[in-house]
A protein has these predicted regions:
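Loop/turn elements at helix/coil->beta-strand transitions in domains of secreted/extracellular proteins
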Residues: 71, 99, 146-148
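Charged catalytic cores and adjacent phosphate/nucleic-acid-binding surfaces used
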Residues: 5-64, 70, 82-91, 96, ...
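Short beta-strand/loop segments at the ligand-binding rim of alpha/beta enzyme cores
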Residues: 145-150, 154-155
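Conserved beta-strand positions in the central sheet of alpha/beta enzyme cores
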Residues: 74-75, 150-151, 182
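Glycine-rich anion/phosphate-binding loops
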Residues: 129-132
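Acidic, metal/ion-coordinating pockets
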Residues: 79
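N-terminal amphipathic/hydrophobic targeting modules at extreme N-termini
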Residues: 1-2
Length: 258
C-alpha cells in the first residue's frame, strides 16, 4: 500500500467510525470500571521455545516483564504452543508463582494475515498449530469451542495484516465477527497503530496492546490494562466479552527487527 493510499485509507476509516448506514455492528461501547485493581499484561509475546524467530527463553521473558511491573503475559507464538508448553511443564509452580501466563497463539491464515487466538484452558485443538486456514473457518472453529480471536497488527504489512491481506469487500463482514483487535503493537508504525485504534472504535472492539517482542530489548514495550482479576484463559475471555475498561498503549521499538 502506497503512503498516499494509506493516508486516505486511514482518513476514510476515521470519517466512517460513527456511521450506522454501513451496517456496522454497534455493540455497547466499553465503560471504565471503578474500584477494581488493574492487571497489566503484554498480550503479544514470542518465545525462543515456540517461535523460530524468537530469541528470548520464556523464563527470561517472564523475568523481564516482572522487572517492568507486569502481572502477566499472553504467549502468542507463531502457529505453535511450544513456548507455553515449556512454561507449563518446566516452570509452572516452581518459579514466578504470582505471575500469570496465558496460552495463546498467533495464527497465520491463508487470506487474512495474522490472527491472535485465545481458547479456554480446557480446550486443546491441534488444528490451531497447522497454519493456513481461511479466516472464516478459523472464526467458526474458535467460536464453536468457546474461544475468542482478533487480528494482530491489523493495518500492518501486506500478507501479515488483516486490512492489507483480506479482500476489501469482505473486510466488514469478518470484522464484525472478531472479539477484539490489537490496537497497539510496539513493532508497528505510528500510522499503523492509529489505523488499528480507528478500527477498534468503528467496531466497538476491545483493543489489546502487545510488544510483539522477539528480542529482550523489546519485551514489555506495550501493555494491556484489564480491570479484572485474570488467572486463566477463561477469565480473559470473559473480560473481553464484557468489554469494559480494557486499555492499551506503549512505546515504539526502534530496532531493525522485532
Amino acid at each position: 500500500m502506497s503512503e498516499t493510499y494509506r493516508h486516505f485509507f486511514v482518513k476514510a476509516l476515521y470519517d466512517m467510525r460513527e456511521s450506522v448506514i454501513l451496517g456496522m455492528d454497534q455493540r455497547r461501547k466499553p465503560q471504565e470500571k471503578e474500584g477494581t485493581k488493574q492487571m497489566k499484561f503484554d498480550m503479544h509475546c514470542h518465545t525462543k521455545e515456540g517461535s523460530m524467530d524468537g530469541k528470548v527463553p520464556i523464563d527470561d521473558f517472564i523475568a523481564e516483564l516482572i522487572r517492568k511491573g507486569f502481572n502477566g503475559m499472553l504467549v502468542s507464538d507463531h502457529n505453535s504452543y511450544n513456548g507455553y508448553r515449556t512454561w507449563k511443564r518446566n516452570i509452572k509452580d516452581q518459579k514466578f508463582k504470582d505471575f500469570v501466563v496465558l496460552k495463546g497463539i498467533e495464527y497465520d491464515t491463508i487470506d487474512a494475515g495474522h490472527i491472535l487466538v485465545i481458547m479456554p484452558e480446557t480446550i486443546k485443538l491441534k488444528i490451531l498449530e497447522l497454519r493456513g486456514l481461511p479466516v472464516q473457518i478459523l472464526i467458526d472453529i474458535v467460536h464453536k469451542n468457546g474461544g475468542i480471536l482478533g487480528p494482530a497488527h491489523p493495518c500492518g504489512e501486506k500478507y501479515l495484516s488483516f486490512t492489507n491481506t483480506l479482500k476489501k469487500r469482505n473486510q466488514m463482514a469478518v470484522m464484525n465477527q472478531f472479539d477484539f483487535l490489537e490496537g497497539f503493537n510496539a513493532c508497528e508504525s505510528v500510522e499503523s497503530n492509529h489505523c488499528a485504534k480507528v478500527l477498534a472504535e468503528m467496531y466497538a472492539l476491545p483493543a489489546f496492546g502487545g510488544s510483539d517482542a522477539h528480542k529482550t530489548d523489546c519485551v514489555g514495550m506495550a501493555y494491556t490494562d484489564i480491570p479484572e482479576q485474570i488467572h486463566c484463559e477463561s477469565d480473559l475471555i470473559r473480560a473481553v466479552k464484557l468489554g469494559e475498561g480494557i486499555k492499551c498503549g506503549g512505546s515504539y521499538y526502534r530496532g531493525t527487527t522485532k
